[in-house]
């Protein structure tokens, strides 16, 4: 019997959890820490957090629901990992081995890389050699050309 797995992909834009239609219009869904608590209760098998922000520094200008104002994606992942009872995959703007190391030290279990694989394909091998192939994931963006 095939086991079904629940693996939500959460998009973070400027420190907020968002929903997107074609990466054009974004609807704010709230605090990423609150979401991970809820998904832990729902027994998600894994979480994927993707940073789609324009900047590396966030200024959300308030403390939401008693959670401190996190200023970087790394701080958010560090905070979220305290409440996650499942593996966390992190992706977005990861172009250096040092950044992978920082995320792994701050609670990430796996790293998703995307754009750098087109610019520097050997980065996948370098990352797998340094951190192990079990924690490096390559994600691929695609677009249908026939309009569907």
Residue ranges and their predicted role:
Residues 12-35, 87-94, 143-148:
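Active-site mouth loops of central-metabolism enzymes
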Residues 4-10, 19, 47-49, 88-92, ...:
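Hydrophobic faces of well-ordered beta-strands that scaffold small-molecule active sites
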Residues 38-42, 80, 103, 127:
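Generic structural signal for hydrophobic
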Residues 58-89, 125-142:
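Alpha-helix-loop-beta-strand connector modules within alpha/beta enzyme cores
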Residues 21-27, 54-57, 62-67, 148:
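Short glycine-enriched, charge-decorated loop/helix-capping segments at active-site entrances
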Residues 12-18, 104-148:
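Conserved anion-binding
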Residues 75, 79-111:
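Catalytic cores of alpha/beta
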Residues 34-50:
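Catalytic domains of carbohydrate-active enzymes, especially glycoside hydrolases
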């Amino acid at each position: 019997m095939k086991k079904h797995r629940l693996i939500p992909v959460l998009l973070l834009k400027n420190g907020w959890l968002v929903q997107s239609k074609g990466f054009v219009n974004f609807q704010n869904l709230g605090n990423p820490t609150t979401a991970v608590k809820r998904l832990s209760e729902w027994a998600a098998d894994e979480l994927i957090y993707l940073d789609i922000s324009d900047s590396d520094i966030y200024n959300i200008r308030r403390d939401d629901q008693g959670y401190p104002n996190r200023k970087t994606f790394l701080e958010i992942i560090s905070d979220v990992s305290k409440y996650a009872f499942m593996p966390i995959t992190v992706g977005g703007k990861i172009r250096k081995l040092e950044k992978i190391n920082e995320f792994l030290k701050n609670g990430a279990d796996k790293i998703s890389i995307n754009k750098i694989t087109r610019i520097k394909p050997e980065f996948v091998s370098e990352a797998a050699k340094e951190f192990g192939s079990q924690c490096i994931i390559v994600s691929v963006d695609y677009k249908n050309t026939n309009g569907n």
